[in-house]
Amino acid sequence: MKEHKARKRFGQNFLQDTRIISDIVNAVRPQADDVVIEIGPGLAAITEPLAKKLNRLHVVEIDRDIVCRLKTLPFADKLVIHEGDVLQFDFNGIAGKKKIVGNLPYNISTPLLFKLAEVADDVVDMHFMLQKEVVERMVAAPKSNDYGRLGVMLQYFFDMEMLIDVPPESFDPAPKVDSAVVRMIPVKHRIGKADDFEHFAKLVKLAFHQRRKTIRNNLKELAGDDDLQAVGINPQDRAEHIAPEKYVALSNYLAGKAV
């Protein structure tokens, strides 16, 4: 079979480091009857060892040439191939609690993570290869430089941990950035639940719109000083100083006032 060339428009960098591949599969801990979805199987580096342990493996792939390759693999009878754009994929269309895994295309990682947050209630866990800088933002704590909108929104849905550092030479072609594997487990006992999630999401987006400004300035169209102080937020603080649960509390307080 002719060699597949990585396509830049699909953000393709193919994992080839056998140690990293083994570490990822061990982290996923696949059991035969698990419902597992792999995003972007590529040249099947993770697909093959997963398929060996599973009765069935769902794969989502946009590249038609790779889809054709997948159909010729010795374990193709174990694969359920979903050809198309993962940003349009209906994860709820696959029954059961799911494990989701993948070497995510870095050019769509943020919108894809937000999409996956919407199906968190039907997920056991997720393991993703991402740009290391993105993982650092996902797991960042308040008062750190990496803490921002992405971290607040994903920490609302998931407990997250950076598991594996992955250097550029682990891929072909080698990306220009370091990568990392993150584990994401849906939060079972949330500190606070947003009464109006759309309002909460809008509030967080506004809060981090201009990082150097105070929370008072960034949220002036939604909240006054009295509102901020009512939930224990100092109006002079910047957005990165405020914990996720404080954003939830503020959103609920403002939503309650509007009723």
Swiss-Prot record:
Binding site for S-adenosyl-L-methionine: N13, L15, G40, E61, D85, N103
Keywords, sorted A to Z: Cytoplasm, Methyltransferase, RNA-binding, rRNA processing, S-adenosyl-L-methionine, Transferase
Catalyzed reactions per annotation: adenosine(1518)/adenosine(1519) in 16S rRNA + 4 S-adenosyl-L-methionine = N(6)-dimethyladenosine(1518)/N(6)-dimethyladenosine(1519) in 16S rRNA + 4 S-adenosyl-L-homocysteine + 4 H(+)
E.C. number: 2.1.1.182
One GO cellular component term noted in the UniProt record for this chain: cytosol
Pfam annotation, one family: RrnaAD
Location relative to the cell: Cytoplasm
Top-tier EC class: transferase
Gene3D superfamilies: Ribosomal RNA adenine dimethylase-like, domain 2, Vaccinia Virus protein VP39
Example GO molecular function: RNA binding
Alphabetical list of NCBIfam families matching this protein: ksgA
Role this protein plays: Specifically dimethylates two adjacent adenosines (A1518 and A1519) in the loop of a conserved hairpin near the 3'-end of 16S rRNA in the 30S particle. May play a critical role in biogenesis of 30S subunits.
Family: Belongs to the class I-like SAM-binding methyltransferase superfamily. rRNA adenine N(6)-methyltransferase family. RsmA subfamily.
Protein name, per record: Ribosomal RNA small subunit methyltransferase A
Species: Neisseria meningitidis serogroup C / serotype 2a (strain ATCC 700532 / DSM 15464 / FAM18)
